[in-house]
Regions:
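ATP-dependent small-molecule kinase phosphotransfer cores
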Residues: 33-81, 85-89
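NTP-dependent small-molecule kinase module
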Residues: 1-2, 18, 22, 26, ...
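A glycine- and Lys/Arg-enriched "phosphate-lid" helix/loop adjacent to the NTP-binding pocket
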Residues: 93-135
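Conserved glycine(s) of the Walker
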Residues: 15
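P-loop (Walker A) phosphate-binding loop of NTP-binding proteins
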Residues: 11
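Short glycine-rich anion-binding loops that position phosphate/pyrophosphate groups of nucleotides
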Residues: 79-82, 102-104, 149
Length: 166
């Protein structure tokens, strides 16, 4: 692995945390999830949005990403972390893996989550994803389409592509 930090980006619910944990285990490195870091320090994301608003959440997210990428390992970001230009520039020192999807399986993945930006469910998810997709694509060193493969095969593809990027 050429760069010491692998950062997983992509839309909410695509599997960044699930794949990230397994990837970190396979690479024998630490795993950090920026959403979990925010929750541990500041409380539930939904409550942060309700009490402090999205701009404050995004500021907390910038801090979490900066902290997470300061040490070697695998990092899963929140879906909107890439909205920050500061975060975008910081990701330049990492290997960015974009987990893409066509959205066909997202309804079941999103059904069991409390996501403050998805008041209208899958329609909101699609709109947000289309808005962010160009940013995900521009930041990616590696793109993995998760639509037609299992998490295990996506993980194998990431490991193979990371080895090729060395």
């Amino acid at each position: 692995m050429g760069k010491d930090v692998v950062v997983l980006i992509g839309p909410m619910g695509v599997g960044k945390t699930t794949i990230g944990k397994k990837l970190a285990r396979a690479l024998k490195v630490e795993f950090r999830d920026t959403d979990a870091m925010i929750v541990a320090e500041h409380g539930a994301i939904g409550e942060i949005f309700a009490k402090l608003g999205e701009p404050e959440f995004r500021r907390l997210e910038e801090v979490a990403v900066a902290s997470a990428i300061s040490e070697p390992g695998v990092v899963a970001t929140g879906g909107g972390a890439v909205l920050s230009e500061l975060t975008q520039s910081r990701l330049g020192s990492t290997t960015v893996v974009y987990l893409s999807t066509d959205g066909r399986h997202m309804a079941s993945r999103l059904a069991n989550g409390n996501r403050p930006l998805l008041q209208n469910g899958l329609d909101d998810w699609r709109r947000i994803y289309e808005e962010r997709k160009p940013t995900y694509e521009s930041l990616a060193d590696i793109t993995i389409n998760t639509s037609n493969q299992t998490m295990a095969s996506a993980l194998d593809e990431i490991k193979t592509r990371l080895t090729k990027n060395d």
